[in-house]
Amino acid sequence: MPEKKPSKPQVAENPIADVFENRHPSAAEKKWAEKTLAPTLEKAPERPIGAPTGVNLDERDNARFTTISGVPIRRLYTQADLPEDWTEEKYLGYPGAPPFTRGIHATGYRGKLYTMRQFSGFASPEETNQRYKYLLEHGGGGISVAFDLPTLMGYDSDHAASEGEVGKCGVAIDSLEDMEILFGGIDLEKTTVSMTINSPASVLWAMYLVVAEKQGADWNKISGTIQNDILKEYIAQKEYIYPPAPSMRLVIDTFEFGSKFTPRFNTISISGYHIREAGSTALQELAFTLYDGIEYVEWARRRGLDVDDFGPRLSFFFNAHNDFFEEIAKYRAARKIWGQVMQERFGAKNQRTWLMRFHTQTAGVSLPAQQPMNNIARVALQALAAVLGGTQSLHCDSYDEALALPTEEAARIALRTQQIIAYESGVTQTVDPLGGSYFLEASTLQMEKGAFDYFSKLDAMGGMVKGIERGYPQKEIAEASYQFQRAAESKEKVIVGVNEFVIEEESPHILYIDESVARQQTAKLKTLRARRSNDEVRRTLDALKKAAAQEPKAGTNGNISPANTMPYIVDAVRAYATVGEICEALREVYGTYTEVSIT
């Protein structure tokens, strides 16, 4: 049977019908559509969507131009695609002022460039310390700590569950001693540090605070961020330890403690990054992330905390994926929505509470192992979208993201990508340079509406914790992930080097972490436990368990709650209790969480 050739594109009966669909074009646009567009489409129909070769158009008659998330894109955007009451003052505004669509700072990057914060951590604290110093010497503006899986799960390196994972996907941190090594020779009053840690966040943060204290740093002056976003663990990343309610209690403990003792430190980075990496659409990333933020504020207010006390230290973390304009629209909508929610839903009076400050990381999930050097171009475009969207800090993934932890060369190229955008592209010289684009403004409003639709659904469920227990966000993400995979396998979405333009290639040089790191960490733990006062460790852990078992209530007379766990964790850290020992003490009180089956 002869091979069926792809058919020619078919011209619709009315090729300009979409010009009038759900919109009111101007007389000039109607004239253009009839006199210029229609004849053009008759002579040269628009190209097929998806793969350039081997796809039968008869089988793809439902294909449309869409974003990577599947949102339809019009041929041309004009004033007709904006609300009839659209004005610059009402919908767009000015940078540094409500509704914050154009940014939270009046001067944008003319005042201060985004912080170039490369996510890094591998093997031992000693090796990672050297990598941090290398990055700082080559222009990095801050440190972002990647921990290994045992640390993320609250296990010491010598625990049976840690076998084969020590130092593999981040740095192994077991005790205060390791944290002292990690930041040795780095001035913590002058360096902002972000730590990607969630279930054991309060433990690792306590270790950081004690290291700063030992350096002679003033807690009032140190700045940085702990991720501390447990909700997205239940939704997407799955690195949880305790059930949702006690986990939320630990998060609110850090809010209260931070407001009192570390006013410049962000006690949470509410994270959409992992939600997107799990397969969500851009809209789902936006909506679920912001609603996670709403949930944290609700829980903090129920504790009796004032939103204007902790609100200014809430920060966010977003993904930068491949669809350039969709990503920029997402960031702009996020700022606008958050400012509105904080004012109208929570009655925040402090303008700093209205501001959404966010970090961005390029999309690791978009960087395939095939033809990895292509990822340099992908990362550059993603990073550019983040900058045009007004990010406060940025991490560029390395081109070898899918293969291993980055080599020194790969990490340097990633940092240089940020620097080229900042210093050579010209995009940082004016504020919100794409503002006013009909396409971008329409996309921003579409994101905003979609997010509030999700908010209504989650409100009806009783909040995000209730939604998680029902499996709602998990199901939404699973369906979106399936649809994207289907589109990739059918070549409806082209992935260069993966489903099109494929070549045979050799494997590149990658970084390898051997098992000596685990042996080294185990030996250090043995020595530590022999040297420290184990009676003091037991005393501090018993005190922590007693506090954790109490119901926390709002503090009085400017003090924090007597049951706040943070002071007890700090005491245990000072006694050189390990990450695993502190987390085990909390496991004894709270138990562990098993996810319900999602069907």
Regions found by a protein language model. Name each.
Residues 164-168, 232-242, 275-280, 318-323, ...:
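Short beta-alpha connecting loops at secondary-structure transitions
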Residues 21-25, 31-73, 79, 84-87, ...:
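Gly/Pro-rich turn-and-neighbor structural signature
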Residues 204-206, 279-287, 321-333, 362-376, ...:
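Short glycine/threonine-rich loop-to-helix capping motif typified by GTGT followed
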